[in-house]
């Protein structure tokens, strides 16, 4: 039964989602989520560059990671194992870019002591939280799918809302305590999470053995 099957699906096994089996509705949902995450990435990257926020740089990496994850759900699952392995290495590298920017900004803030503009930081955090809430709601119908990527995409959107709350808290605290430390602390926390994510993607890519795919092809 497909994603929109007409029979009672309450007791059916959850559908297996891949790039080839995603039905029209599910693919449309994932595509929208990917687009929203890309929008959030550019918004936070631009604002972070303007106000010098370590937290926003770190959260921009989260948006980039989620965009690439959803893009892989739509496309890369249909690739060969070797191609997916190369894509995973590239994904890990891309995630590192904003994360490194977050650490660099945090170090600069420690030296200069200049805090980001708190109102802009807070408003941007609210915008990012709205984007992540919309993504979480869109993915809610797919969260029980028998696919680690699909469930991971939903969990990532849900967890990103919590990260946005941390950034919003940093902005509010900075309004009353004009210091760079709230932004620095939140930026470092989210940055560490991003480094861990990049490390996991890299290690998973290394663990995938293209020879296994060749063996499977020989058995067919």
Regions found by a protein language model. Give the residues of each.
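Alpha-helical transmembrane cores and adjacent cytosolic helix/loop segments
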Residues: 2-220
């Amino acid at each position: 039964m497909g994603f929109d099957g007409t029979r009672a699906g309450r007791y059916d096994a959850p559908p297996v989602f891949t790039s080839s089996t995603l039905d029209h509705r599910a693919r449309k949902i994932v595509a929208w989520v990917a687009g929203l995450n890309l929008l959030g990435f550019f918004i936070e990257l631009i604002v972070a560059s303007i106000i010098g926020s370590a937290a926003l740089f770190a959260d921009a990496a989260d948006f980039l990671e989620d965009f690439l994850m959803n893009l892989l759900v739509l496309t890369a699952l249909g690739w060969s194992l070797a191609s997916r392995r190369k894509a995973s290495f590239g994904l890990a590298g891309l995630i590192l870019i904003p994360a490194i920017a977050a650490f660099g900004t945090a170090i600069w803030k420690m030296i200069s002591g200049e805090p980001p503009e708190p109102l802009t930081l807070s408003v941007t955090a609210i915008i990012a939280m709205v984007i992540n809430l919309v993504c979480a709601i869109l993915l809610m119908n797919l969260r029980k799918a028998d696919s680690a990527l699909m469930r991971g995409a939903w969990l990532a959107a849900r967890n990103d809302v919590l990260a946005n709350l941390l950034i919003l808290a940093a902005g509010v605290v900075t309004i009353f305590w004009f210091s760079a430390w709230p932004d620095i602390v939140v930026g470092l926390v989210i940055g560490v999470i991003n480094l861990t994510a990049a490390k996991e993607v890299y290690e998973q890519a290394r663990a995938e053995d293209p020879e296994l795919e060749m063996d499977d092809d020989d058995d067919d």
